[in-house]
Amino acid sequence: MNRAETEQPQFAVIGCGLIGRKRVLALGPNPPLLYTCDLDAARASALAAEAPGCTAVTDAARVFADPRVTAVIISTLNASLAPLALAAVRAGKHALVEKPGALNATELRAVADAARSTGAKVRLGYNHRFHGAMLKARELVDAGALGPLMFLRGRYGHGGRKGYDREWRADPALSGGGELIDQGVHLIDLAGWFLGEFPTVEGHAATYFWDMAVDDNAFLSLRTADGQTAWLHASCTEWKNLFSLEIYGRTGKIIIDGLGGSYGPERLTYYPMPVEMLGKPTPPQIHEFPTDRSWALETEAFVDDIRLGRDPSPGLAEGIHTLEVVERIYARAKGG
């Protein structure tokens, strides 16, 4: 792990489905992609064809054994994320691991222990932090435009599709859970990014519509040590795809709607609320973000993690905390 900071990392992508393809496109021609790896040889080959000089393989051990590979992007089913990340960091490879990073927090703690031993940098793939509206919200919050934060509300959902309850996400052995560990973790991560950790976790997960052994809706009330609250709902019975995040401070609020595509145009509306104007809000400031660059920006951040030797954010600590929240909600659903 002692390569020069200015050296260009060389990558491999493990998992060549929809997200793996997004990751390859986000890499672009630089940094170099040496391998695509997937249990489906045809899928690995198809993705390798999009990156000149890339080799398709079906055995991840070949990737980990190649000393030229600096970093791996792991975008498999949830059940394979932590085992592959653990093998990667033990081999001295940096890793960008797609959310949620593991089936549970225990798996992710093992990755963290190994990363501390080898010095590998591990970033969790929560690309929503890199959406334009989220970055603008972060800028406004950090500048004090909202004053001290009080609470936030988040809703995220889709309506599934025919046969959704027979896909891998409906199998807890492969997914670790349902809608909470799928889209819900994005909400938990964003809430933690703005408010901090949540020692108080309340809520429940339930299955209302889909014929599956995992949840299709989750409702969360999370509180920081200072009492700031995150009120979250994740759903795959949201018949019209929806993303909404509202952040409230003492002197203003932000509303983020949409993520682009089927979730509608991505827009941030900032409502200043000076104390002297209480009850008479000033005209809002509206910012629109027609282009999603989140995947590319997240990849750039990961490359900088490696080059600068900095701790990724979100990294393993944030990923573990998010999964601890998930586990506490699932325990409540089971009467624990």
Residue ranges and their predicted role:
Residues 1-51:
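N-terminal Rossmann-like dinucleotide-binding module
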Residues 1-5, 71-73, 301-336:
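C-terminal helix-rich "cap/oligomerization" subdomain common to oxidoreductases
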Residues 6, 120, 147-151, 331-336:
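C-terminal capping/lid region of NAD(P)-dependent oxidoreductase domains
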Residues 39-42, 286-300, 314:
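Active-site loop of classical SDR/Rossmann-like NAD(P)-dependent oxidoreductases
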Residues 51-114:
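Beta-loop-alpha module in the N-terminal Rossmann-like domain of NAD(P)-dependent dehydrogenases
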Residues 113-121, 135-150, 249, 253:
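Basic phosphate/pyrophosphate-binding loop/patch that engages nucleotide-derived ligands
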Residues 128-204, 208-211, 336:
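Predominantly a Rossmann-like dinucleotide-binding segment in NAD(P)-dependent oxidoreductases
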Residues 189-262, 292, 296-310:
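Contiguous beta-strand/loop segments that form the cofactor/metal-binding neighborhood of enzyme cores
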